[in-house]
Regions:
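Positively charged n-region of N-terminal signal peptides that target proteins for export
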Residues: 1-4, 211
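Boundary at the C-terminal end of the N-terminal hydrophobic targeting segment
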Residues: 16, 23-26
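Short beta-strand-centered segments that line the small-molecule binding cleft or hinge
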Residues: 81-85, 92-106
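Exported/periplasmic ABC-transporter solute-binding proteins
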Residues: 25-57, 63, 67-77, 88-89, ...
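Bacterial N-terminal signal peptides
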Residues: 4-18
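Serine endopeptidase catalytic core focused on the charge-relay Asp
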Residues: 114
Length: 307
């Protein structure tokens, strides 16, 4: 009895000591505030956060949201991150124009795909949607009753990019009504959700298919359909082709750009030294391995952005 009691007390002390050591270790990390495109959530939480805790002694405190919305919050002074990571040049140029940063470095690239739910009644058709002789993917998505999801083009670049992709698809497949039949109006409440909700609804079978970056569905075990380079916004050599389509939002005419991710240290970063070390780390081999693991491509010959 006494031996059992002593063993129990010893185990309790060890457990308490372990918890205390973990708390001390967490307290020893320097906080790093990173605002990043919502589509990067899985990689940032599962790959980057634990890696920089070891490599940079940093505790990444992330804010995931649409890049356009984040850029507007930064410019308004509503948030003050150390580092901002956006997808496509547009949101980063907003921050550059407001003189919140002096330059932005390309760190990765992706492309548009169509993600779909394995629980959907259209899953088997979509799995064959890119094959010769099969029913084309766009015809499947035009089927009445298909539940398609996307994000708000006013706040999230992906929501804008799926409109560009469908417009390019309309030209590529010689189907002038393709975008209207699949998306309906640009702002379609039946299709538009917050970015994390889109993937969650696919997993639950509440949506049949959705827009996505190639980096997203694989991380969640969801199948996806690859699109031709002429329409997927992922090939820098096709930029002139991409720019043949436009979208008008809030009185502004917008053009697509290749899907490159840019990182910038903000001028009023609370931890400027650590932020610059993080930016250097993002361009190194450890980050490259993590990016590749989560299906991000190299930025290739993409150039830095300056004011």
């Amino acid at each position: 009895m006494k031996i059992a009691l002593l063993v129990s007390i010893f185990a309790g002390l060890c457990s308490a000591l372990s918890i205390t050591n973990e708390a001390i270790a967490a307290d020893a990390l320097t906080p790093l505030q990173v605002a990043y495109a919502g589509s990067m959530g899985s990689m940032m939480d599962g790959g980057v956060k634990p890696a920089i805790a070891k490599s940079l002694n940093a505790d990444m405190q992330g804010r995931a949201q649409g890049s356009t919305g984040l850029a507007n919050l930064i410019v308004a002074g509503s948030i003050r991150p150390d580092v901002f990571i956006s997808v496509t040049p547009g949101p980063m140029r907003t921050v550059l124009k407001a003189e919140k940063t002096s330059n932005a470095t390309p760190i990765a690239r992706t492309e548009m795909v169509i993600a779909y739910s394995p629980k959907s009644q259209y899953a088997s058709d979509l799995a064959k949607g890119g094959e010769v002789g099969a029913k084309p993917w766009w015809q499947i998505l035009e089927t009445p009753g298909v539940r398609f999801g996307r994000t708000d083009p006013n706040t999230d670049p992906q929501g804008l990019n799926i409109i560009f992709t469908m417009q390019l698809a309309a030209d590529y497949y010689h189907q002038p009504d393709l975008a209207d039949k699949i998306l309906g109006p640009q702002i379609n409440p039946q299709q538009i959700f917050q970015e994390p909700d889109v993937m969650a609804r696919l997993q639950a079978g509440q949506l049949d298919a959705s827009s996505a970056y190639k980096t997203q569905p694989g991380a969640l075990g969801l199948p996806f359909l690859s699109l031709p380079k002429e329409i997927n916004l992922g090939d820098a050599s096709m930029e002139d082709t991409y720019k043949k389509v436009t979208v008008t939002l809030n009185g502004k005419t917008l053009h697509p750009a290749p899907l490159v991710f840019y990182a910038a240290v903000l001028k009023d970063a609370p931890q400027p030294e650590l932020a610059n070390r993080f930016l250097t780390w993002l361009q190194g081999p450890e980050a490259r391995e993590i990016l590749s693991r989560y299906r991000y491509d190299s930025p290739g010959d993409s150039k830095p952005l300056t004011p």
